[in-house]
Amino acid sequence: MINITLPDGSRREFESPVSVMQVAQSIGAGLAKATIAGRVDGQLVDASDVIDHDASLRIITAKDAEGVEIIRHSCAHLVGHAVKQLYPEVKMVIGPVIAEGFYYDIYSERPFTPEDMAAIEQRMQALIAQDYDVIKKVTPRAEVIEVFAQRGEEYKLRLIDDMSDDITAMGLYYHQEYVDMCRGPHVPNTRFLKAFKLTRISGAYWRGDAKNEQLQRIYGTAWADKKQLDAYILRMEEADKRDHRRIGKAQDLFHLQEEAPGLVFWHPKGWSLWQVVEQYMRKVYRDSGYGEVRCPQILDVSLWQKSGHWDNYQDAMFFTESEKRTYAVKPMNCPGHVQVFNQGLHSYRDLPIRYGEFGACHRNEPSGALHGILRVRGFTQDDGHVFCLESQIESEVTAFHQQALAVYTAFGFDDIQIKIALRPEKRLGDDATWDKAEAALRSALGVCGVEWQELPGEGAFYGPKIEYHLKDAIGRTWQLGTMQVDFMMPGRLGAEYVDENSQKKHPVMLHRAIVGSMERFIGILIEHHAGAFPSWLAPVQVVVANITDAQADYVDAVRKTLANQGFRVSADLRNEKIGYKIREHTLQRVPYLLVVGDREKENGAVAVRTRSGEDLGTMTVSAFIERLQAEQAA
């Protein structure tokens, strides 16, 4: 007998091994029709998979998050089915699930066009309408190789060749004549795939390496039903309006170009925005007791070997050579801060010692992963490191938590989720050390009285970390700040202090950042505010515009008065109609436009308009300055 325990605690008995779908059928026809997969003893399996032992089972439907993920993965396979019918000469590569969607990488001699994407989507809809079953066959490795060799799918053969020799069989999923390999699970029938849409085509490289051949990447999204799909499309339309690349170009903030992939060219207004953020964060450093430092961009690889980055991070590092020595361009700031700490002898009474740096780092991100200024190769972090005693961890983490929340509130974020990323599989140190580090973070958050989610396997290689996830104006979540506890690196790099017994010991090292990458944070700010920044943050806070040439001198005097008060202000003296000027600066999302005619000039006043079109009337320059100063303070 096979005993199946359901989520409500009830049990069902079967005389012989039984599939997930058969269990669902025994419960009811409605559930069977809705069944996508199952979770057997916690493991996701296909609806056709057989249970041959006593087990717990949860039926997965489209109402479950796992069900939607499976729908997306199956849609990627459906892309393959449609593409191979339309363009049989192409070679299929990989088709994973990503956030809110999926993609498929394909090798094609010619780039796909928007017309191709429309044809692929139409063929997918036609295939779904056939309502066919997706068939899973667990197949010996040698036979899988034969299947793909006969079909000329050389990339599939390369992927198989990369797999461990321990893998002797794998799942093949058949969409009629099309076959793909996958761990699964997948939907049992194409009727689950109706709520999908292909979204865009881009280029990618095989294995993410620009030296390899270029692939075509087809992106799509899929949902449980049309209502969810329509809601997603509306969100994406709003996200497109807020796209930082679009706004960055419209407001002349920055640009990127092919000669410097993943590296940003900041324009005057964009750099002004950067400086506002940096100076704000510099004040956070000062107010929190951090001494600002500056460390070299390149360091001999021997230091990265000692720190552990060489073994755990070298694939993401850039290197250069000089006089037969190899140097690494720093991907992180932490080893440099340890070198600063190591200059001199420290007593336990000196701790905690806090260093902060706006440190420029470089990481060799795959070209296909680059995205505007949200994912770059060269970036600057508001990076800080605290060298402290174990007994000081809780108070330091608590203080950081309060700092981080205050910063996020100031920049307009009030929906914040907190997570703890726990030990990854590839890591330094022993379990006892990790136990201690993870317990320290839990304890500190407990003192703060906040709830958190735990993420097994997602910590840094040298320690667990607290992550701050912020929800933006259209409901997207961004991971920003981190606080990491590190018992490893101080010992590896020789950081020491003298304790109360005159013994040398290694301090605990806390790695912290509030905004993280400045580039990424500014990109998030642009999209969160749709380019309409709060007046204190805006790259240009005020534009003073004349109606005729007769007010030019007065406009310049007003501009100078505001500039002398520290405001970011420009004058628009162009020979254009005032209505044109108002429209242009409104589109530029400038918070305030001061209009000056003969009457304002005579009275030493300005007519104040906001970017939303609100007419605040006429006021003296000093009254307007008071208004702007109040917003600065806020």
Curated annotation (Swiss-Prot):
The name this protein goes by in its record: Threonine--tRNA ligase
SUPFAM superfamilies assigned to the protein according to its UniProt record, in alphabetical order: Class II aaRS ABD-related, Class II aaRS and biotin synthetases, TGS-like, ThrRS/AlaRS common domain
Binding partners and assembly: Homodimer.
Biological role stated in the UniProt entry: Catalyzes the attachment of threonine to tRNA(Thr) in a two-step reaction: L-threonine is first activated by ATP to form Thr-AMP and then transferred to the acceptor end of tRNA(Thr). Also edits incorrectly charged L-seryl-tRNA(Thr).
Keyword line: Aminoacyl-tRNA synthetase, ATP-binding, Cytoplasm, Ligase, Metal-binding, Nucleotide-binding, Protein biosynthesis, RNA-binding, tRNA-binding, Zinc
Keyword Repeat: no
Molecular function (Gene Ontology), one example: metal ion binding
Binding-site residues, Zn(2+): C334, H385, H511
Cofactor: Zn(2+)
Cofactor: how and how many bound: Binds 1 zinc ion per subunit.
Similarity comment text for this entry: Belongs to the class-II aminoacyl-tRNA synthetase family.
Species of provenance: Xanthomonas oryzae pv. oryzae (strain KACC10331 / KXO85)
CDD domains, per database record: TGS_ThrRS (cd01667), ThrRS_anticodon (cd00860), ThrRS_core (cd00771)
